[in-house]
Amino acid sequence: MNKVKCYVLFTALLSSLYAHGAPQTITELCSEYRNTQIYTINDKILSYTESMAGKREMVIITFKSGETFQVEVPGSQHIDSQKKAIERMKDTLRITYLTETKIDKLCVWNNKTPNSIAAISMKN
């Protein structure tokens, strides 16, 4: 009987930790990183530029408001686990631009110029 109570208590504690451990919104996700801030965009991407030129390999997006953001194209400065995520973000932005999907919010690192995208939230 005591074993069952301990198991139930442990399961309840573990479940509550797991439920609160993963961020549920872009705001919660962004708060986990230093040098980040949330930009509320609520607009379509006005321009999409992809550069493969040497040290400036990146995707740059701009909005009507004039806000400009970047995603670096994976290079030698990135570890393998980062490269796939960066490629996915680049692909997501390209598709978002081509389908004219609205970007709701961006979480960006504000210690780079232009600000570098860490996370994206979209809506139709």
Curated annotation (Swiss-Prot):
Protein's job: The biological activity of the toxin is produced by the A chain, which activates intracellular adenyl cyclase.
Gene Ontology biological-process annotations: killing of cells of another organism
Top-level taxon of the source organism: Bacteria
Stretches that traverse the bilayer: none
InterPro entries reported for this sequence: Enterotoxin, Enterotoxin_B
Range of residues in the leader sequence: 1-21
Binding partners and assembly: Heterohexamer of one A chain and of five B chains.
Cited Pfam families: Enterotoxin_b
UniProt-listed SUPFAM superfamilies: Bacterial enterotoxins
Gene responsible for this protein: eltB
Alphabetical UniProt keywords: Disulfide bond, Enterotoxin, Signal, Toxin, Virulence
Organism: Escherichia coli
Disulfide-bond pairs as recorded: C30-C107
One MF annotation (Gene Ontology) recorded for this entry: toxin activity
Entry protein name: Heat-labile enterotoxin B chain
Coiled coil: none
GO cellular component: extracellular region
